[in-house]
């Protein structure tokens, strides 16, 4: 396992800059995808396999949102950076999309995904990829020296069970710790990723 904080740090400090540069120079989308799986490790942003719940999955309380094939990357990232629900945003490994991390109530992952997807579509006309609806979906490392990490995000814990958007200072303060320090997530090496 690794932490979301380590994942974010690696994206910002260029741990995989060489591999990302190689991937982004590849014009064919299929070949780019193959290189990504071949060269990069991946994580499950939303938690750990073999966790404490009945399904064997321990949720991190963080949802990954993917916005692929974006026409204007900087505008998309800027919109996400201005959104009070987003705690982190960065350019995807392909260089053609933007990823955002959103704190949620992990007990209602799919419901939170639906609410988040509708929020981003309704607010910014951004169409989210469906893959992260599955809490075990993979997120590959990327490189973005200008990765955005919120100092304070609104909590969307209530996007799940209660169905009400809630902005709570206490959960917003906890978010900084959960996202940058303590949340453990599964880490898949490139070799393991090829077998998935």
Task: Set out the residue ranges of the language-model regions.
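DNA replication initiation modules
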Residues: 1, 9, 49-71, 104-196
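Signature for HUH/AEP ssDNA processing cores
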Residues: 1-96, 103-112
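Short Gly/Ser/Thr- and Asp/Glu-enriched loop/turn motifs at secondary-structure junctions
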Residues: 91-98, 133-138
């Amino acid at each position: 396992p690794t932490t979301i904080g380590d994942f974010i740090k690696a994206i910002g400090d260029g741990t995989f800059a060489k591999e990302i540069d190689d991937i982004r120079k590849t014009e064919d989308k299929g070949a780019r995808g193959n290189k990504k799986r071949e060269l990069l490790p991946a994580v499950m942003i939303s938690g750990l396999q073999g966790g404490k719940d009945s399904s064997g999955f321990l949720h991190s309380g963080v949802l990954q949102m993917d916005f692929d094939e974006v026409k204007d990357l900087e505008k998309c990232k800027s919109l996400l950076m201005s959104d009070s629900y987003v705690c982190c945003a960065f350019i995807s490994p392909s260089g053609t999309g933007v990823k955002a991390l959103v704190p949620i109530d992990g007990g209602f992952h799919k419901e939170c995904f639906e609410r988040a997807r509708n929020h981003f579509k309704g607010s910014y006309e951004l169409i989210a990829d469906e893959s992260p609806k599955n809490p075990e979906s993979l997120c590959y490392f990327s490189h973005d020296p200008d990765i955005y990490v919120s100092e304070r995000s609104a909590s969307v814990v209530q996007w799940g069970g209660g169905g009400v958007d809630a902005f709570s200072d206490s959960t917003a303060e906890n978010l900084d710790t959960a996202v940058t320090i303590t949340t453990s997530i599964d880490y898949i090496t490139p070799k393991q990723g090829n077998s998935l």
